Amino acid sequence: HLRNHFGSKPFKCGKCNYSCANKSMLNSHMKSHSNIYQYRCANCCYATKY
């Protein structure tokens, strides 16, 4: 919690310059580098990673 107050972002992406305060946000960010579209609409061709 204190990282939010001090602006510390120790979790860094190895593929770009993104950094964040907690590991769960980094895990979520890493999906942006993936080609896996986890959620697909059953009625059309729309798909998203998140």
UniProtKB/Swiss-Prot annotation:
Zinc finger (C2H2-type): 1-5, 11-33, 39-50
Keyword Mitochondrion: no
Cited InterPro entries: Znf_C2H2_sf, Znf_C2H2_type
GO annotation, biological process: segmentation
Source taxon at top rank: Eukaryota
Compartments where found: Nucleus
GO MF annotation, one: DNA binding
Annotated Gene Ontology cellular component terms: nucleus
The entry's keywords: Developmental protein, DNA-binding, Gap protein, Metal-binding, Nucleus, Repeat, Zinc, Zinc-finger
Residues making up the signal peptide according to the UniProt record: none
Family of this protein: Belongs to the hunchback C2H2-type zinc-finger protein family.
Functional description taken from the UniProt entry: Gap class segmentation protein that controls development of head structures.
The protein's name: Protein hunchback
Organism: Pholcus phalangioides
